[in-house]
């Protein structure tokens, strides 16, 4: 089940495996949510929305794993969803601020430089896993419902 999308993302290409470190703290859903999101890697847009679909992708993954999601197509809606955690944890939702809008994805690990690795929809027009600058993320939220 893979598909394609339309664009957002300043994330770099996935680094070599030797540069990736697993997060020291696994979070709620670190297998279920991450595994579900990974099924869509490399594919296009599985959401049916023609643009700005990162939040729609996040809601879809949450619903497929038994969570309610926010029901919003706005990435910023996830800044009030679940329980805030202090830093990147596997399974946490990362909310990013960006000029002209925001972006949201699920944390899968931390790279050797300490940057979170995240799966997100609408990253270079597809579902992608890539490190992002930790300074771009303003909220880490653990799903609780």
Can you describe what each PLM-predicted range is?
Residues 1, 58-60, 74, 96, ...:
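Detector for methionine-enriched segments
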Residues 1-45, 115, 132-145:
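Intrinsically disordered, low-complexity
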Residues 67-131:
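...with weaker cross-activation on analogous glycine-rich loops/strands in unrelated enzymes
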Residues 38-90:
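Catalytic cysteine-centered active-site loop
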Residues 6, 18, 23, 30-31, ...:
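Generic serine detector
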